[in-house]
Amino acid sequence: MKENEQRLLDAIADMREDEALALARAMLDAGDAPLRVLELCRTAMETVGKRFQEGEYFLPELILAGEMLERIGDMA
C-alpha cells in the first residue's frame, strides 16, 4: 500500500475530515483510479464500524464518516 493510501485510511478512520478530503482530491488529481480511492474509503469505514462496535466511536462519528464518504464519492 502506498503511503498516501495509508494516510487517507488513517485520516478517515481518525475523523480528520479536512485532511481526508484533501488527500482524496490530491490522489484523484494525481491520476489514481476513482474506484481505488473509493475502495480505500470502504476499508476505512470498516475501521470506523469496528470502533463503533467497540464503543470507541458513537453516532456522531458514524455520521461524520458517512459525510466524508459521500463528499469523496462526489469527487470521484
Label the predicted regions.
Residues 1-76:
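Long amphipathic alpha-helical segments
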